[in-house]
Amino acid sequence: MEWSDEGIILGVRRHGEAGAIVELLTRGHGRHLGLVRGGASSRLRPLLQPGNSVLAVWRARLDEHLGYYQLEGTRMRAATMLASSHAVYGITHLASLARLLPERDPHEDIYEMLERTLDDFDDVGDAATHLIRFELAMLAELGFGLDLSACAATGATTDLIYVSPKSGGAVSRTAGEPWREKLLRLPDFLREDNDGRNGWSDQDLRDGFDLTGRFLLRNVLEPRGQGHSDARDGFINAVAKHLARAAIV
């Protein structure tokens, strides 16, 4: 058995004295593990870092075997990402989200979104909005997508500023006003009628993480006996600290 594919490194763990088991999210073969001979060596250490993109060749005698990877770096992001705390927490959290997908099950849209998210991780605000969008995409991919296109109560497609914590549907300002204390806020940058000119605010980011966090916890994590990763909390705190420092300056 042999195939080649694009992949993003999610995690690496040592195997034996010199090898390493590398976990990739690949474009066409999903989340897939393989053994890299000599993967624990100093020569391969810069390559085998979470967040790096690679061209992977996988070989095994049978399809169900772990198999062996031969990897070639195509986008080496890790060195830059390791220099900022938000990026370190971010890639760790993104990897934990990707692990919610079944192994060896292709999810090309998620792969492409992860690629774009990592490419924009230099800017803290962009990283946060991309990560919130990635969490929304994961909810949809796992069968729990939110309908933010129209008001769940009236069908209106404009002035959507709330989300129902029960249905996951958007709610307009007028329809939601009587119950605003019980509704979740829909960040401006997630509104479909936002053409991008309005940007985002610190409150938008808090609302966004609250929104995706609640549905991930209730619909995906708690049924699996899990909670939010420490890396998610670390990312949110790192973003908040960075924005607070920027506001002072």
Curated annotation (Swiss-Prot):
Pfam families: RecO_C (PF02565), RecO_N (PF11967). Transmembrane segments: none annotated. Involved in DNA repair and RecF pathway recombination. GO terms for cellular component: bacterial nucleoid. Keywords: DNA damage, DNA recombination, DNA repair. One of its GO terms (biological process) is double-strand break repair. This is DNA repair protein RecO. NCBIfam families: reco. It comes from the Bacteria. Belongs to the RecO family.
